[in-house]
Amino acid sequence: MEQKRTRNPNGRSTIYLGNDGYWHGRVTMGIGDDGKPDRRHVKRKDKDEVVEEVGKLERERDSGNVRKKGQPWTVERWLTHWVESIAPLTCRYKTMRGYQTAVYKHLIPGLGAHRLDRIQNHPEYFEKFYLRMIESGLKPATAHQVHRTARTAFGEAYKRGRIQRNPVSIAKAPRVEEEEVEPLEVEDMQLVIKAALERRNGVRYVIALALGTRQGESLALKWPRLNRQKRTLRITKALQRQTWKHGCSDPHRCGATYHKTEPCKAACKRHTRACPPPCPPACTEHARWCPQRTGGGLVEVDVKSRAGRRTVTLPDQLFDLILKHEKLQGAERELAGTEWHDGEWMFTQPNGKPIDPRQDLDEWKAILVEAGVREARLHDARHTAATVLLVLGVPDRVVMELMGWSSVTMKQRYMHVIDSVRNDVADRLNTYFWGTN
């Protein structure tokens, strides 16, 4: 027989024995998305269990972190929803590519089967997962990047009430040794500039060393952004290669001809970089071969931040080098005739098309070899430019504007002490302690 119930005040929880022989609990959690009261129901054989569950719901409600109604989400479902429907609204292309790799290649295969509301209490699951990644041969930096992606994704789940706490913010991230950057010394810079100016687009690398432009910013420079009267250069865009997407209805079948079924042999000469792994059974990649491909190739995008949109005044010699380069490009344009693609790019292929970032990187490596200078990343040119500003004693505010930094804290990452500065300090100490009064 159903236990007689008295009407509780609005918002109060109710516990009663039903005709079905089960104890029932009903808790008002707030207002649902449809504007109606969000009333949760608990059903158990034992009254104490119902009392306990009702208490949990009440504490959840009172804390302000109410879980959404409906079937509990798995980690896979949430990560897929986040990376496909939430992150793209605010993230740039390269950031999204990193998120997609972390989610689809690592997080979903490793943790996707867990229930979202249960894994929140087990940060150790993530720590064990990172350890498995590293033990499988992946670099700690890769595991650390996956950790950062998971922290962001689960942080969004917390904000939206899917979980009551972010387990990834508690989990220990893999330790990553910070890569030591050695900017080029003055003598090396001079050798690099000399070797670069022997090549078609050599001024592009002089700009990188002198102004600290990022690779994409350098390749996206256009002639209309050069102010010849004021001798300034406006930096507002970046050039990047984006991945093509299938425009067809059956991506797997479309790319079937290019599916890799076996790993490369030990003495593989086909790939200049690391050999790619075999394709998964349901591979939907190889979109660049799709006749209806969309959204890929070289794309001009906005610079990374508002601070990145900047105007720099050119040193006289650099300005003259740019004008000389313009004349040489004009001769190339006349020689190419109708084959020339006029995109107003400052640095181009012989037919006027923009330069691919990979081709640009290969050119940089060749310049270093020709100059007899040690190996250095192309981005080290930006570190070198920032360090030169340090040596020259340029005020922090001016450095921020020239480099396109949004925060002065970037100075700690980009400015380095080079040998000439160390030697100067040693000379000063020598004079102070052992010099003649």
UniProtKB/Swiss-Prot annotation:
Which catalytic residues are annotated?
214, 245, 379, 382, 405, 414 (o-(3'-phospho-dna)-tyrosine intermediate)
Q: Which InterPro entries match?
A: CB (IPR044068), DNA_brk_join_enz (IPR011010), Integrase-like_cat_sf (IPR013762), Integrase_catalytic (IPR002104), Integrase_recombinase_N (IPR010998), Integrase_SAM-like_N (IPR004107), Tyrosine_recombinase_XerCD (IPR050090)
What biological-process terms (Gene Ontology) are attached? Answer: DNA integration; DNA recombination; establishment of integrated proviral latency; symbiont entry into host cell; viral genome integration into host DNA
Ordered alphabetically, the record's keywords are:
DNA integration, DNA recombination, DNA-binding, Plasmid, Viral genome integration, Virus entry into host cell
One MF annotation (Gene Ontology) recorded for this entry: DNA binding
Question: SUPFAM superfamilies this protein is in?
Answer: DNA breaking-rejoining enzymes
Q: Residues in domain Tyr recombinase?
A: 179-428
CDD domains of this UniProt entry? INT_ICEBs1_C_like (cd01189)
| Domain Core-binding (CB) per the UniProt entry, residue ranges | 73-158
Q: What family is it from?
A: Belongs to the 'phage' integrase family.
What does this protein's UniProt record list under function?
Is a recombinase (or integrase), catalyzing the cutting and rejoining of the recombining DNA molecules.
Q: What's the protein called, per UniProt? A: Integrase
Q: Source gene?
A: int
